[in-house]
């Protein structure tokens, strides 16, 4: 299983927050499991930090580099797939994560019930 962390799951992981489910922790820690973080997640965090709506590591780039997570860029194919998704959910960051997960066959680690409205594999965070 290849994982894609949504923003909340990533923040819970980085903060070692007990809100992250044991199943999600086990899957993220599993040796040999590729874990991806989207460029969209970094973008969302930086925007929300600038607005004072979110606390996250001051140097997210260093925190990600210290992890074994792989960075997932946003491609043209991802962007086009996001635009074609049903309009169940209008959050652009979530829509790109859903498109990336579908396109790259990733399981999204999320605590957002809106993701269940899409044809995407989910591991409940």
Place the predicted regions along the sequence by residue.
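Short, well-structured N-terminal submotif of metal-dependent ribonuclease cores
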Residues: 1-37, 50-62, 104, 113, ...
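A generic structural signal for short
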Residues: 12-13, 48-49, 85-86, 100
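Phosphate/NTP-binding elements of NTP-utilizing enzymes
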Residues: 45
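Active-site neighborhoods of divalent-metal-dependent phosphate/nucleic-acid chemistry enzymes
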Residues: 57-61, 66-114, 125
